[in-house]
Regions:
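Short amphipathic alpha-helical heptad-repeat segments
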Residues: 3-18, 56-70
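Amphipathic alpha-helical interaction modules
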Residues: 24-68
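Charged, low-complexity interaction regions
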Residues: 21-31, 47-50, 73-85, 101
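Amphipathic alpha-helical coiled-coil segments with heptad-repeat character
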Residues: 3, 10, 28, 60, ...
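Eukaryotic intrinsically disordered, low-complexity tracts enriched in Ser/Pro/Thr/Gly and charged residues
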Residues: 1-6, 113-115
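Generic L/I/V-rich hydrophobic alpha-helical segments across diverse proteins
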Residues: 13, 17-20, 31, 35-38, ...
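Amphipathic alpha-helical binding modules
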Residues: 71-115
Length: 115
């Protein structure tokens, strides 16, 4: 068994996920990817990109697999899932305290127009 990931407080992650809901529902792929990542960290289940099933607490290897899958989409062949992967990657990095910029204030969805 691998160690769980050190994350922000679950209440903070949940609040950010709730704040992302309107933008995600309006069709922002970046915000949908971010919200899916945060919900996955809170409840487990299939990984948003890999589909790998995980329970709680989410093991580090599962987060690394999702980040790797996101990187493959972002830097791989042009894809309609690029913005989604960028949102997922940003949210996981934020939840892991690797960046201070929350997904709701990130500019990823505005800058990504390449497909």
């Amino acid at each position: 068994m691998t160690a769980p990931v050190a994350l922000r407080d679950p209440a903070v992650i949940s609040a950010e996920s709730d704040t992302l809901r309107p933008a995600a529902k309006s069709g922002s792929a970046f915000h949908q990817g971010a919200r899916d990542a945060l919900r996955w960290l809170l409840v487990g289940g299939p990984g948003p990109l890999t589909g790998g099933i995980t329970g709680l607490p989410i093991p580090l290897r599962a987060v690394v697999a999702e980040l790797s899958a996101a990187e493959a989409v972002i830097y791989g062949r042009p894809s309609g899932r690029r913005d989604y992967a960028m949102g997922l990657e940003h949210a996981l990095m934020w939840a892991e305290l690797a960046t201070e910029t929350a997904p709701t204030t990130a500019r990823g969805s505005e800058r990504s127009t390449r497909q």
